[in-house]
């Protein structure tokens, strides 16, 4: 069985498929239908412990616990709910680390924003997640749990998933792809409703489409690439790791992903007051991304207390959007959610660490 492992060698079942659980149950000396029962309790009912799965023989449940086998659920240590019902969870792992997950509701959908690592090594200057560096990557069950925890907290089934929380997904790509498989097959979330965001990892992005097809059978999730600048020089000022990934090479790799998958690429662009938000920046960005199927998603900067960046005023944001639109670039402006509850990536975790 291709299972995930908790720190210390304990085994977590969350992330395993129905077929894997059936095979594992048989190997445990149980009938195959016990695996199907486990699957239902893991994913449909969201069980947090073997004690809750009363359909399983008590002797087997006790044996699993004694051998250190777990469901793999995380512990909620903090919850913040904004006036618009955006919900941020701070979840604790078994080794005492904390990660953030956000549920963003609208009338029609519930989008959940997931973390892929504890902290982040990319050190983007405007992002709270990278301030403390990287502690470790998350296991598959720790990624999947975030969806279950938000479903439980918000009493609503998630419809869309974005890997835009803590961490760089492409630096934990095997666990991320395994989680996508689980979310798709075991939780019924279509790949087309899943987005993987990256600032660009030169040894992984060029082969992402092929790797996804090998692991998932197809590559239908959306790739979102965080540009945040219209040229290499400014991008390196904002994203230190960009020095290893030339702008044109990054765009070529995005074109390759489009060619292989047929899925348009989304370009994320965070607007920083008086730094990358002027009309000339919009014109240069339009020249860069025009010519292949893509979409630009503008994001107004969410202030971090100890940084000197500013959030642009609404008029500047609209002027930037209008320049792109006039030049034939598909563009949208992401609405900021949860500003009153530190729901920007990494902020609640930093606040918890400072007070706790």
UniProtKB/Swiss-Prot annotation:
Catalysed reactions, semicolon-separated: adenosine(2503) in 23S rRNA + 2 reduced [2Fe-2S]-[ferredoxin] + 2 S-adenosyl-L-methionine = 2-methyladenosine(2503) in 23S rRNA + 5'-deoxyadenosine + L-methionine + 2 oxidized [2Fe-2S]-[ferredoxin] + S-adenosyl-L-homocysteine; adenosine(37) in tRNA + 2 reduced [2Fe-2S]-[ferredoxin] + 2 S-adenosyl-L-methionine = 2-methyladenosine(37) in tRNA + 5'-deoxyadenosine + L-methionine + 2 oxidized [2Fe-2S]-[ferredoxin] + S-adenosyl-L-homocysteine
Domain Radical SAM core, residue spans: 106-340
Misc. comment: Reaction proceeds by a ping-pong mechanism involving intermediate methylation of a conserved cysteine residue.
NCBIfam families per record: rRNA_mod_RlmN
GO annotation terms (biological process): rRNA base methylation; tRNA methylation
Comment on bound cofactor: Binds 1 [4Fe-4S] cluster. The cluster is coordinated with 3 cysteines and an exchangeable S-adenosyl-L-methionine.
Keywords: 4Fe-4S, Cytoplasm, Disulfide bond, Iron, Iron-sulfur, Metal-binding, Methyltransferase, rRNA processing, S-adenosyl-L-methionine, Transferase, tRNA processing
Gene3D superfamilies: 1.10.150.530, Aldolase class I
Cofactors that this protein relies on: [4Fe-4S] cluster
Bridged cysteine pairs (disulfide): 113-345
Function: Specifically methylates position 2 of adenine 2503 in 23S rRNA and position 2 of adenine 37 in tRNAs.
Active site: 100, 345
Superkingdom as given in the UniProt entry: Bacteria
Molecular function terms from GO: 4 iron, 4 sulfur cluster binding; metal ion binding; rRNA (adenine(2503)-C2-)-methyltransferase activity; rRNA binding; tRNA (adenine(37)-C2)-methyltransferase activity; tRNA binding
Short name of any one Pfam family annotated for the protein: RlmN_N
Binding residue positions for S-adenosyl-L-methionine: 167-168, 197, 226-228, 302
Enzyme class, broadest EC rank: transferase
Cross-referenced CDD domains: Radical_SAM (cd01335)
Name of the protein: Probable dual-specificity RNA methyltransferase RlmN
Assigned EC number: 2.1.1.192
């Amino acid at each position: 069985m291709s299972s995930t492992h908790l720190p210390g060698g304990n085994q977590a079942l969350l992330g395993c498929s129905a077929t894997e659980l059936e095979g594992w149950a048989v190997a445990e000396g149980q009938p195959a239908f016990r695996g199907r029962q486990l699957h239902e309790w893991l994913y449909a009912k969201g069980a947090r412990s073997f004690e809750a799965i009363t359909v399983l023989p008590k002797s087997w449940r006790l044996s699993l616990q004694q051998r250190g086998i777990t469901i793999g659920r995380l512990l909620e240590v903090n919850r913040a709910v904004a006036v618009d019902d955006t919900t941020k969870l701070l979840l604790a792992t078994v080794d005492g680390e904390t990660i953030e997950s956000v549920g963003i509701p609208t009338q029609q959908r519930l989008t959940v924003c997931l973390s892929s690592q504890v902290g982040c090594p990319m050190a983007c200057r405007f992002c709270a997640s990278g301030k403390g560096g990287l502690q470790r990557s998350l296991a598959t069950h720790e990624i999947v749990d975030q969806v279950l925890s938000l479903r439980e907290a918000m009493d609503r089934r998630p419809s869309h998933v974005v890997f835009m929380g803590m961490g760089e997904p492409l630096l934990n790509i095997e666990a991320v792809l395994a989680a996508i498989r689980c979310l798709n097959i075991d939780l019924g979330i279509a790949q087309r409703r899943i987005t993987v965001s990256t600032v660009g990892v030169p040894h992984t992005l060029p082969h992402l489409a092929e790797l996804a097809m090998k692991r998932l059978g197809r590559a239908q999730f959306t790739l979102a690439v965080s540009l945040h600048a219209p040229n290499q020089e400014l991008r390196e000022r904002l994203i230190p790791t960009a020095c290893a990934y030339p702008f044109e090479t990054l765009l070529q790799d995005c074109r390759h992903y489009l060619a292989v998958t047929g899925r348009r690429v989304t370009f994320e662009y965070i607007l920083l007051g008086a730094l990358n938000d002027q009309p000339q920046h919009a014109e240069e960005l339009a020249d860069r991304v025009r010519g292949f199927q893509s979409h630009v998603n503008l994001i107004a900067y969410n202030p971090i207390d100890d940084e000197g960046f500013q959030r642009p005023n609404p008029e500047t944001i609209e002027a930037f959007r209008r320049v792109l639109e006039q030049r034939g670039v598909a563009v949208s402006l992401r609405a900021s959610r949860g500003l009153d509850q530190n729901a920007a990536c990494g902020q609640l975790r930093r606040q918890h660490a400072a007070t706790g």
